[in-house]
Amino acid sequence: MIQEQTMLNVADNSGARRVMCIKVLGGSHRRYAGVGDIIKITIKEAIPRGKVKKGDVLKAVVVRTKKGVRRPDGSVVRFDGNACVLLNNNSEQPIGTRIFGPVTRELRSEKFMKIISLAPEVL
């Protein structure tokens, strides 16, 4: 469950380290985002010579949450932290070329197959 002001880790090599959610996209009064949802973020911490810099406003897809995601069989997949992958504002394709850490099977839609293929592990 990601809401406005939530700090997230970045699970790719775009150059950002920490980001903050500034808007949950999809509906005018939508409050929370889960795994697979697109959010608007601003970069709070970045490494030198990265593809993005501090203060940039981008879109991101949530790939891991502490709240977890419930499967139809009743199991819940939870993680130790909240993480996202940065997306290009226009094409909504990943900015980074590598993904760090596992991602969930819920990302297997037409839009995020690139993230699934880059991820080292799909749970």
Swiss-Prot record:
PROSITE patterns linked: RIBOSOMAL_L14
Instruction: Give the GO terms filed under biological process for this record.
Output: translation
* Gene Ontology MF, one: structural constituent of ribosome
Among the Pfam families in the record, one is: Ribosomal_L14
InterPro entries in the record, alphabetically? Ribosomal_uL14 (IPR000218), Ribosomal_uL14_bac-type (IPR005745), Ribosomal_uL14_CS (IPR019972), Ribosomal_uL14_sf (IPR036853)
Of the GO CC terms on this record, one is: cytosolic large ribosomal subunit
Q: Name the keywords, alphabetized.
A: Ribonucleoprotein, Ribosomal protein, RNA-binding, rRNA-binding
What does the subunit comment say?
Answer: Part of the 50S ribosomal subunit. Forms a cluster with proteins L3 and L19. In the 70S ribosome, L14 and L19 interact and together make contacts with the 16S rRNA in bridges B5 and B8.
Q: Briefly state the protein's biological role.
A: Binds to 23S rRNA. Forms part of two intersubunit bridges in the 70S ribosome.
The entry assigns this protein to a family as follows: Belongs to the universal ribosomal protein uL14 family.
> What is the protein's given name?
Large ribosomal subunit protein uL14
Q: Provide the species name.
A: Cronobacter sakazakii (strain ATCC BAA-894)
Please spell out the taxonomic lineage of the organism that makes this protein: Bacteria, Pseudomonadati, Pseudomonadota, Gammaproteobacteria, Enterobacterales
> Which gene name belongs to this protein?
rplN
